[in-house]
Amino acid sequence: MPAHLLQEEISSSYTTTTTITAPSSRVLQNGGGKLEKTPQYVEEDIRPEMKDDIYDPTYQDKEGPRPKLEYVWRNIILMSLLHLGALYGIILIPTCKIYTLLWAFAYYLLSAVGVTAGAHRLWSHRTYKARLPLRVFLIIANTMAFQNDVYEWARDHRAHHKFSETDADPHNSRRGFFFSHVGWLLVRKHPAVKEKGGLLNMSDLKAEKLVMFQRRYYKPGILLMCFILPTIVPWYCWGEAFPQSLFVATFLRYAIVLNATWLVNSAAHLYGYRPYDKTISPRENILVSLGAVGEGFHNYHHTFPYDYSASEYRWHINLTTFFIDCMAALGLAYDRKKVSKAAILARIKRTGDESYKSG
Protein backbone atom coordinates (compact mmCIF):
# COMPACT_ATOMS: atom_id res chain seq x y z
CA MET A 1 0.00 0.00 0.00
CA PRO A 2 1.39 3.47 -0.88
CA ALA A 3 2.62 5.49 2.08
CA HIS A 4 0.02 8.25 1.70
CA LEU A 5 -2.82 5.72 1.66
CA LEU A 6 -1.43 3.97 4.72
CA GLN A 7 -1.21 7.34 6.48
CA GLU A 8 -4.86 8.03 5.61
CA GLU A 9 -5.81 4.61 6.99
CA ILE A 10 -3.92 5.39 10.17
CA SER A 11 -5.56 8.77 10.65
CA SER A 12 -9.04 7.50 9.91
CA SER A 13 -9.04 4.95 12.73
CA TYR A 14 -8.01 7.14 15.66
CA THR A 15 -10.44 7.13 18.53
CA THR A 16 -12.26 10.36 19.35
CA THR A 17 -11.19 11.57 22.80
CA THR A 18 -12.98 13.39 25.56
CA THR A 19 -11.25 15.89 27.84
CA ILE A 20 -11.68 15.71 31.61
CA THR A 21 -10.19 18.03 34.17
CA ALA A 22 -10.34 16.14 37.47
CA PRO A 23 -6.99 16.39 39.24
CA SER A 24 -5.45 13.85 41.59
CA SER A 25 -2.17 13.79 43.50
CA ARG A 26 1.15 12.21 42.67
CA VAL A 27 4.34 11.62 44.61
CA LEU A 28 7.45 13.37 43.32
CA GLN A 29 10.83 11.86 44.04
CA ASN A 30 13.64 14.33 43.44
CA GLY A 31 17.35 13.73 43.28
CA GLY A 32 17.80 14.06 47.03
CA GLY A 33 15.23 11.41 47.81
CA LYS A 34 12.74 13.95 49.20
CA LEU A 35 9.09 13.16 48.56
CA GLU A 36 6.44 15.77 47.96
CA LYS A 37 2.94 15.91 46.51
CA THR A 38 2.28 17.36 43.08
CA PRO A 39 -0.95 17.50 41.05
CA GLN A 40 -1.59 14.90 38.39
CA TYR A 41 -4.24 15.32 35.74
CA VAL A 42 -5.96 12.74 33.57
CA GLU A 43 -6.49 14.55 30.28
CA GLU A 44 -8.50 12.10 28.24
CA ASP A 45 -10.81 9.21 28.90
CA ILE A 46 -10.05 7.36 25.67
CA ARG A 47 -10.04 3.88 27.21
CA PRO A 48 -12.82 3.81 29.81
CA GLU A 49 -13.00 0.01 29.89
CA MET A 50 -9.78 -0.40 31.91
CA LYS A 51 -8.20 1.58 34.75
CA ASP A 52 -5.96 -0.94 36.51
CA ASP A 53 -2.82 0.33 34.77
CA ILE A 54 -3.41 3.94 35.91
CA TYR A 55 -1.15 5.18 38.71
CA ASP A 56 -2.70 5.03 42.18
CA PRO A 57 -1.35 7.99 44.20
CA THR A 58 -3.05 6.81 47.39
CA TYR A 59 -0.80 3.77 47.83
CA GLN A 60 2.20 4.27 50.10
CA ASP A 61 4.86 1.80 51.21
CA LYS A 62 4.53 0.49 54.73
CA GLU A 63 7.02 1.89 57.20
CA GLY A 64 9.85 -0.26 58.45
CA PRO A 65 12.58 -2.40 56.87
CA ARG A 66 11.91 -4.52 53.82
CA PRO A 67 11.69 -8.30 54.30
CA LYS A 68 14.95 -10.18 53.90
CA LEU A 69 15.66 -11.17 50.29
CA GLU A 70 14.97 -14.80 49.43
CA TYR A 71 17.12 -15.89 46.50
CA VAL A 72 15.66 -18.12 43.81
CA TRP A 73 18.75 -20.19 43.10
CA ARG A 74 17.20 -22.00 40.14
CA ASN A 75 16.73 -18.67 38.35
CA ILE A 76 20.19 -17.46 39.34
CA ILE A 77 21.82 -20.60 37.93
CA LEU A 78 19.75 -20.64 34.73
CA MET A 79 20.29 -16.94 34.02
CA SER A 80 24.02 -17.32 34.64
CA LEU A 81 24.24 -20.29 32.26
CA LEU A 82 22.20 -18.45 29.62
CA HIS A 83 24.48 -15.43 29.67
CA LEU A 84 27.62 -17.57 29.65
CA GLY A 85 26.19 -19.33 26.60
CA ALA A 86 25.41 -15.96 25.02
CA LEU A 87 28.99 -14.79 25.57
CA TYR A 88 30.25 -17.93 23.85
CA GLY A 89 27.77 -17.21 21.06
CA ILE A 90 29.42 -13.82 20.49
CA ILE A 91 32.75 -15.61 19.99
CA LEU A 92 31.12 -17.94 17.44
CA ILE A 93 29.55 -15.16 15.34
CA PRO A 94 32.46 -14.94 12.83
CA THR A 95 32.10 -18.68 12.13
CA CYS A 96 28.34 -18.54 11.47
CA LYS A 97 26.74 -18.74 8.07
CA ILE A 98 25.00 -15.54 6.99
CA TYR A 99 21.64 -17.34 6.96
CA THR A 100 22.06 -18.19 10.63
CA LEU A 101 22.69 -14.56 11.53
CA LEU A 102 19.67 -13.44 9.50
CA TRP A 103 17.57 -16.16 11.13
CA ALA A 104 18.66 -15.06 14.62
CA PHE A 105 17.89 -11.42 13.81
CA ALA A 106 14.45 -12.27 12.39
CA TYR A 107 13.69 -14.41 15.44
CA TYR A 108 14.74 -11.54 17.70
CA LEU A 109 12.39 -9.13 15.90
CA LEU A 110 9.45 -11.54 15.96
CA SER A 111 9.84 -12.38 19.63
CA ALA A 112 10.35 -8.71 20.53
CA VAL A 113 7.12 -7.76 18.73
CA GLY A 114 5.38 -10.59 20.59
CA VAL A 115 6.28 -8.79 23.80
CA THR A 116 5.76 -5.16 22.74
CA ALA A 117 2.74 -5.35 20.43
CA GLY A 118 1.33 -8.41 22.21
CA ALA A 119 1.92 -8.73 25.96
CA HIS A 120 2.48 -5.00 26.41
CA ARG A 121 0.33 -2.79 24.22
CA LEU A 122 -2.50 -5.23 23.45
CA TRP A 123 -2.96 -7.38 26.54
CA SER A 124 -1.48 -5.27 29.36
CA HIS A 125 -2.86 -1.88 28.33
CA ARG A 126 -5.65 -2.66 25.83
CA THR A 127 -4.47 0.25 23.67
CA TYR A 128 -5.87 -1.34 20.52
CA LYS A 129 -7.89 -4.36 19.47
CA ALA A 130 -6.74 -7.28 17.34
CA ARG A 131 -8.63 -9.80 15.26
CA LEU A 132 -8.10 -13.53 15.80
CA PRO A 133 -5.33 -14.12 13.20
CA LEU A 134 -3.24 -11.29 14.70
CA ARG A 135 -3.86 -12.50 18.25
CA VAL A 136 -2.73 -16.00 17.28
CA PHE A 137 0.42 -14.59 15.69
CA LEU A 138 1.18 -12.46 18.75
CA ILE A 139 0.67 -15.36 21.17
CA ILE A 140 3.10 -17.48 19.14
CA ALA A 141 5.62 -14.63 18.91
CA ASN A 142 5.29 -13.97 22.62
CA THR A 143 5.96 -17.63 23.39
CA MET A 144 9.12 -17.36 21.29
CA ALA A 145 10.29 -14.59 23.64
CA PHE A 146 9.90 -16.62 26.89
CA GLN A 147 9.34 -13.74 29.32
CA ASN A 148 6.58 -15.40 31.34
CA ASP A 149 3.18 -16.08 29.85
CA VAL A 150 1.01 -13.16 28.78
CA TYR A 151 -1.26 -13.36 31.82
CA GLU A 152 1.61 -13.16 34.32
CA TRP A 153 3.46 -10.56 32.23
CA ALA A 154 0.37 -8.33 32.04
CA ARG A 155 -0.44 -8.70 35.74
CA ASP A 156 3.09 -7.67 36.73
CA HIS A 157 3.05 -4.82 34.24
CA ARG A 158 -0.27 -3.42 35.40
CA ALA A 159 1.06 -3.53 38.97
CA HIS A 160 4.20 -1.74 37.76
CA HIS A 161 2.10 1.13 36.41
CA LYS A 162 -0.47 1.33 39.19
CA PHE A 163 2.05 1.13 42.05
CA SER A 164 5.09 2.54 40.25
CA GLU A 165 8.26 3.09 42.32
CA THR A 166 6.84 1.41 45.43
CA ASP A 167 7.34 -2.01 46.99
CA ALA A 168 4.23 -3.19 45.11
CA ASP A 169 6.04 -2.49 41.82
CA PRO A 170 7.60 -5.84 40.77
CA HIS A 171 10.75 -4.15 39.41
CA ASN A 172 10.85 -1.00 41.53
CA SER A 173 13.66 1.18 40.12
CA ARG A 174 14.18 2.85 43.50
CA ARG A 175 15.91 -0.39 44.50
CA GLY A 176 18.67 0.24 41.97
CA PHE A 177 19.66 -0.56 38.40
CA PHE A 178 20.48 -4.24 38.93
CA PHE A 179 17.28 -5.01 40.80
CA SER A 180 15.03 -3.31 38.24
CA HIS A 181 16.97 -4.88 35.35
CA VAL A 182 17.19 -8.55 36.35
CA GLY A 183 17.50 -8.83 40.12
CA TRP A 184 13.75 -8.86 40.63
CA LEU A 185 13.64 -12.17 38.76
CA LEU A 186 16.31 -13.70 40.99
CA VAL A 187 14.52 -13.20 44.32
CA ARG A 188 11.08 -13.93 45.73
CA LYS A 189 8.53 -11.20 45.14
CA HIS A 190 8.01 -8.61 47.83
CA PRO A 191 4.79 -9.40 49.79
CA ALA A 192 3.30 -6.11 48.56
CA VAL A 193 3.69 -7.24 44.95
CA LYS A 194 1.73 -10.40 45.67
CA GLU A 195 -0.89 -8.58 47.72
CA LYS A 196 -1.59 -5.74 45.30
CA GLY A 197 -1.08 -7.79 42.16
CA GLY A 198 -3.67 -10.25 43.41
CA LEU A 199 -6.25 -7.47 43.71
CA LEU A 200 -5.94 -6.28 40.11
CA ASN A 201 -8.85 -6.91 37.80
CA MET A 202 -7.60 -9.53 35.33
CA SER A 203 -11.03 -10.66 34.16
CA ASP A 204 -10.36 -9.50 30.60
CA LEU A 205 -7.41 -11.88 30.26
CA LYS A 206 -9.14 -14.72 32.07
CA ALA A 207 -11.85 -14.47 29.41
CA GLU A 208 -9.28 -14.52 26.59
CA LYS A 209 -9.09 -18.15 25.43
CA LEU A 210 -5.76 -17.72 23.62
CA VAL A 211 -4.12 -16.21 26.69
CA MET A 212 -5.39 -19.02 28.91
CA PHE A 213 -4.35 -21.64 26.34
CA GLN A 214 -0.82 -20.24 26.30
CA ARG A 215 -0.74 -20.20 30.11
CA ARG A 216 -1.90 -23.81 30.31
CA TYR A 217 0.69 -25.12 27.84
CA TYR A 218 3.44 -22.59 28.47
CA LYS A 219 6.27 -24.95 29.43
CA PRO A 220 6.10 -27.16 26.32
CA GLY A 221 5.40 -24.03 24.27
CA ILE A 222 8.57 -22.20 25.29
CA LEU A 223 10.64 -25.38 25.02
CA LEU A 224 9.56 -25.70 21.39
CA MET A 225 9.39 -22.06 20.31
CA CYS A 226 12.25 -20.48 22.28
CA PHE A 227 14.81 -23.30 22.24
CA ILE A 228 14.15 -26.26 19.91
CA LEU A 229 12.87 -24.47 16.79
CA PRO A 230 15.52 -21.71 16.58
CA THR A 231 18.25 -24.32 17.08
CA ILE A 232 16.96 -26.99 14.70
CA VAL A 233 16.12 -24.77 11.70
CA PRO A 234 19.70 -23.53 10.95
CA TRP A 235 21.18 -26.96 11.62
CA TYR A 236 18.67 -28.85 9.45
CA CYS A 237 17.79 -26.34 6.71
CA TRP A 238 21.20 -24.97 5.68
CA GLY A 239 23.68 -27.20 7.42
CA GLU A 240 24.82 -24.87 10.18
CA ALA A 241 27.05 -26.47 12.82
CA PHE A 242 25.11 -27.39 15.94
CA PRO A 243 27.16 -25.21 18.36
CA GLN A 244 26.53 -22.13 16.19
CA SER A 245 22.83 -22.96 15.98
CA LEU A 246 22.54 -23.39 19.73
CA PHE A 247 24.77 -20.63 21.08
CA VAL A 248 24.13 -17.91 18.46
CA ALA A 249 20.60 -18.45 17.13
CA THR A 250 19.21 -19.52 20.49
CA PHE A 251 21.20 -18.46 23.57
CA LEU A 252 22.62 -15.18 22.24
CA ARG A 253 19.38 -14.18 20.53
CA TYR A 254 17.34 -14.99 23.63
CA ALA A 255 19.70 -13.07 25.92
CA ILE A 256 19.53 -10.00 23.66
CA VAL A 257 15.72 -10.00 23.66
CA LEU A 258 15.63 -10.36 27.43
CA ASN A 259 18.09 -7.54 28.08
CA ALA A 260 16.39 -5.24 25.58
CA THR A 261 13.15 -5.66 27.53
CA TRP A 262 14.86 -5.34 30.91
CA LEU A 263 16.47 -2.04 29.89
CA VAL A 264 12.99 -0.54 29.71
CA ASN A 265 12.60 -1.32 33.42
CA SER A 266 16.09 -0.17 34.41
CA ALA A 267 17.80 2.33 32.07
CA ALA A 268 14.55 3.97 30.94
CA HIS A 269 13.68 4.65 34.58
CA LEU A 270 17.06 6.18 35.40
CA TYR A 271 18.62 7.87 32.34
CA GLY A 272 17.05 10.40 29.99
CA TYR A 273 14.70 13.37 29.83
CA ARG A 274 11.22 13.79 31.28
CA PRO A 275 9.50 16.18 28.86
CA TYR A 276 5.95 15.09 29.73
CA ASP A 277 6.07 14.60 33.49
CA LYS A 278 9.08 15.46 35.63
CA THR A 279 7.34 14.14 38.74
CA ILE A 280 7.83 10.50 37.76
CA SER A 281 10.92 8.35 37.30
CA PRO A 282 10.46 7.01 33.73
CA ARG A 283 12.54 8.78 31.05
CA GLU A 284 12.77 9.14 27.29
CA ASN A 285 15.70 6.94 26.24
CA ILE A 286 16.39 6.59 22.51
CA LEU A 287 18.97 3.81 22.91
CA VAL A 288 16.45 1.70 24.80
CA SER A 289 13.91 2.35 22.06
CA LEU A 290 16.33 1.03 19.45
CA GLY A 291 16.81 -2.27 21.25
CA ALA A 292 13.25 -2.67 22.48
CA VAL A 293 11.65 -1.82 19.10
CA GLY A 294 9.96 1.37 20.29
CA GLU A 295 9.55 1.01 24.05
CA GLY A 296 12.08 3.63 25.15
CA PHE A 297 9.73 6.64 25.16
CA HIS A 298 9.00 5.75 28.73
CA ASN A 299 8.15 9.12 30.23
CA TYR A 300 5.43 9.48 27.61
CA HIS A 301 4.24 5.92 28.16
CA HIS A 302 3.84 6.27 31.93
CA THR A 303 2.13 9.63 31.43
CA PHE A 304 -0.24 8.23 28.79
CA PRO A 305 -0.30 4.41 29.22
CA TYR A 306 -3.44 4.12 27.09
CA ASP A 307 -1.76 5.39 23.87
CA TYR A 308 -1.13 2.52 21.44
CA SER A 309 2.07 4.16 20.13
CA ALA A 310 3.68 4.38 23.59
CA SER A 311 5.15 7.55 22.07
CA GLU A 312 4.05 10.89 20.70
CA TYR A 313 5.81 10.35 17.38
CA ARG A 314 4.28 7.14 15.97
CA TRP A 315 6.93 5.52 13.73
CA HIS A 316 9.99 7.43 15.00
CA ILE A 317 12.33 4.69 16.31
CA ASN A 318 9.19 2.69 16.97
CA LEU A 319 8.98 -0.52 14.96
CA THR A 320 6.13 -1.75 17.14
CA THR A 321 3.85 1.14 16.18
CA PHE A 322 4.76 0.63 12.52
CA PHE A 323 3.84 -3.05 12.88
CA ILE A 324 0.48 -2.27 14.51
CA ASP A 325 -0.32 0.31 11.84
CA CYS A 326 0.51 -2.18 9.09
CA MET A 327 -1.81 -4.70 10.76
CA ALA A 328 -4.49 -1.99 10.85
CA ALA A 329 -4.02 -1.37 7.13
CA LEU A 330 -4.64 -5.09 6.61
CA GLY A 331 -7.76 -4.94 8.77
CA LEU A 332 -6.25 -7.05 11.58
CA ALA A 333 -5.86 -4.26 14.16
CA TYR A 334 -8.42 -1.59 14.97
CA ASP A 335 -9.63 0.88 17.61
CA ARG A 336 -6.13 2.23 18.21
CA LYS A 337 -6.14 4.70 21.08
CA LYS A 338 -4.15 7.90 20.50
CA VAL A 339 -3.79 10.91 22.79
CA SER A 340 -4.59 14.25 21.15
CA LYS A 341 -1.85 16.79 20.48
CA ALA A 342 -3.70 19.37 22.56
CA ALA A 343 -3.73 17.07 25.58
CA ILE A 344 -0.01 16.31 25.16
CA LEU A 345 0.93 20.00 24.98
CA ALA A 346 -1.26 20.82 27.97
CA ARG A 347 0.43 18.13 30.02
CA ILE A 348 3.91 19.29 28.95
CA LYS A 349 3.07 22.82 30.05
CA ARG A 350 1.93 21.63 33.47
CA THR A 351 4.45 18.95 34.42
CA GLY A 352 7.23 18.75 31.80
CA ASP A 353 10.92 19.32 32.56
CA GLU A 354 11.22 21.90 29.73
CA SER A 355 13.28 19.52 27.56
CA TYR A 356 10.43 19.07 25.06
CA LYS A 357 11.14 19.72 21.39
CA SER A 358 8.19 19.64 19.03
CA GLY A 359 8.60 17.38 16.01
From Swiss-Prot:
Pfam families: FA_desaturase. Substrate binds at N75, N148, R155, D156, R188, K189, W262. Residues 94-97, 238-241 are lumenal. A motif (Histidine box-2) lies at residues 157-161. Residues 1-72, 119-217, 264-359 are cytoplasmic. Its EC number is 1.14.19.1. Keywords: Endoplasmic reticulum, Fatty acid biosynthesis, Fatty acid metabolism, Iron, Lipid biosynthesis, Lipid metabolism, Membrane, Metal-binding, Oxidoreductase, Phosphoprotein, Transmembrane, Transmembrane helix. Expected to bind 2 Fe(2+) ions per subunit. Fe cation 2 binds at H160, H269, H298, H302. InterPro entries: Acyl-CoA_DS, FA_desaturase_dom, FADS-1_CS. The modification Phosphoserine is found at S203. The histidine box domains are involved in binding the catalytic metal ions. This is Stearoyl-CoA desaturase. It comes from Sus scrofa (Pig). The gene is SCD.
